[in-house]
Amino acid sequence: MDYRVLLYYKYVTIDDPETFAAEHLKFCKEHHLKGRILVSTEGINGTLSGTKEDTDKYIEHMHADNRFADLTFKIDEAESHAFKKMHVRPRREIVALDLEEDINPREITGKYYSPKEFKAALEDENTVILDARNDYEYDLGHFRGAIRPDITRFRDLPEWVRNNKEQLDGKNIVTYCTGGIRCEKFSGWLVKEGFENVGQLHGGIATYGKDPETKGQYWDGKMYVFDERISVDVNQIDKTVIGKEHFDGTPCERYINCANPECNKQILVSEENEEKYLGACSYDCAKHERNRYVARHHISNEEWQRRLNNFKDVPEHTHA
């Protein structure tokens, strides 16, 4: 494979995020990189793709800056670019938790668990494993026995915790996310909220899956990623499929966005059912006048109506 995908973050002071972002974007474009990077006064959060040569130059460029000299990159091999464009954007936060009183992970955060320590925590009955990601990420893949917060945005996680404290009180809490950045801030919030014995998987799922000792054990399904790949493997020992097809409940790991642009919900759908149900998550979305699947495939009004009739045979929840 000639391409690589880099995933990284660091909480570090960046005095002028706007200027940094503009200069960084220029460097990335000059080296044919594509991806998404967020920059704020609290640090940097990025994922990008490029050839081995170009990503090596990027890593070298970052390590030459004293602020990022110890920056750790998680690296995946890839067959092509994982992004269509290159964006470097200044933001208020590099991961949006939107707290009234912001958390600085450099001052307060949960204990770091190595992959080996995290595996032991998974085997400990007195430890609660809390997924810090969104529900659609969990539904594609998660650690065995982990709690699934019913959220679609990271910023909703604190409210979920407050409403479900009984699941966490009196337990050791270890949280995890894709690459570790969300847990840095979220675990610090848990500590500030008064929870004791709070930990986090250092380096996230991405690091755990590549660890030569743990080999991704106890992970079921695939890991959702925010790029063109959609998902990647984690468990090197006993792979399983846990995702369930939106319409018929069969094993599925194929995510699409609902064809209704006003919905855009991510659903697990087979190619057959995407065609059958017009790329939509529900009857109402399938009949939406701006259905993108209908437009993309130049479906006639007669054929559109014929496929809408397919919804008569599916569970009631898809008619909402």
UniProtKB/Swiss-Prot annotation:
Record family assignment: Belongs to the TrhO family.
Gene Ontology MF terms in the entry: oxidoreductase activity, acting on paired donors, with incorporation or reduction of molecular oxygen
Alphabetized Gene3D superfamilies for the sequence: 3.30.70.100, Rhodanese-like domain
Name under which the protein is recorded: tRNA uridine(34) hydroxylase
Gene that this polypeptide is encoded by: trhO
Annotated Rhodanese domain residues: 123-217
Keyword vocabulary terms for this entry: Oxidoreductase, tRNA processing
Domain of life, per lineage: Bacteria
Catalysed reactions listed for this entry: uridine(34) in tRNA + AH2 + O2 = 5-hydroxyuridine(34) in tRNA + A + H2O
Role: Catalyzes oxygen-dependent 5-hydroxyuridine (ho5U) modification at position 34 in tRNAs.
Active-site feature positions: C177
EC code: 1.14.-.-
